Design a protein with these regions (language model features):
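Bacterial lipoprotein signal-peptidase II cleavage site
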Residues: 18-34
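Alpha-to-beta junction loops
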Residues: 88-89, 106-115, 162-163, 190, ...
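Acidic, polar ligand-binding/catalytic clefts
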Residues: 80, 89-155
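Short, solvent-exposed loop/turn elements at domain surfaces
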Residues: 61-66, 122-123, 175
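Short helix-initiation/N-cap motifs at beta->coil->alpha
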Residues: 92-103, 186-200
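Sec-dependent bacterial lipoprotein signal peptides
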Residues: 1-20
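Extracytoplasmic small-molecule ligand-binding "clamshell" domains
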Residues: 39-116
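Bilobed "Venus flytrap"/periplasmic-binding protein-like clamshell domains
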Residues: 56-61, 71-84, 135, 139-195, ...
Length: 206
């Protein structure tokens, strides 16, 4: 027996993504006749019997965010589809982003993590990652009517007195620390608070 962890999810997610890509001809009847072998698989343990528990930081729409207190978004839908394929119930645990991998590695909180997370060597030491399923760019945001523009941002943001709000533990934080060493990098627990700080005049950029 072993924990489900991300090791099993790696295979399941890859299979699920392949299934989604060719399932346009499936019928409701076929959906109700899932392979019993998935449901009968007892080679792993779960945090909660019969339930796939997903850890996330629900502040990153459209991948994961809260609507009326419920986690929704692309990652949530993807993980729920995996749970359905395994014949499991599904739950989401909302945690601060910089605690997700340590929480997964420690066990007892959640079985898998989906949180728009970039694969990095340091993170791979704590957990096994699936194949990349989405590629995107990151950008620094500033107030629209301010003096900083995309043409001068590289120089203007790298000055003493500039405060850049970042979400703690993200690759965005790493990028800002490496590229704006003269600015003050102020971590926040979630991206919502980071943007709120800028809008309140407590930060120059996010």
């Amino acid at each position: 027996m072993k924990k489900l962890g991300v090791v099993l999810a790696a295979g399941v997610l890859a299979a699920s993504l392949a299934l989604f890509g060719c399932s346009s001809n499936s019928t409701a009847g076929n959906d109700t006749k899932k392979d019993d072998s998935a449901k009968a698989d007892t080679s792993y343990t779960l945090v909660k019997d019969g339930t796939l528990t997903m850890g996330t930081s629900a502040d990153y729409p459209p991948f994961e965010n809260l609507e009326n207190g419920e986690a929704v978004g692309f990652d949530v839908d993807l993980c729920k589809a995996v749970a359905d394929e395994l014949g499991l119930k599904f739950e989401v645990v909302n945690n601060q982003f910089d605690t997700l991998l340590t929480g997964l590695a420690a066990g007892g909180k959640f079985d898998v993590v989906l949180a728009g997370m970039t694969v990095e060597p340091e993170r791979a030491e704590l957990a096994d990652f699936t194949d990349t399923y989405y590629v995107d760019d990151q950008a620094v945001a500033v107030m629209k009517d301010g003096a900083i523009t995309k043409d001068n941002a590289k120089e203007e943001l790298n000055k003493a007195g500039v405060i850049i709000a970042v979400q703690s533990g993200t690759t965005g934080e790493t990028y800002c620390r490496e590229n704006f060493p003269n600015a003050t990098i102020q971590p926040y627990g979630n991206s919502t608070d980071s943007f709120a700080a800028m809008q309140a005049g407590q930060a120059t950029a996010v």
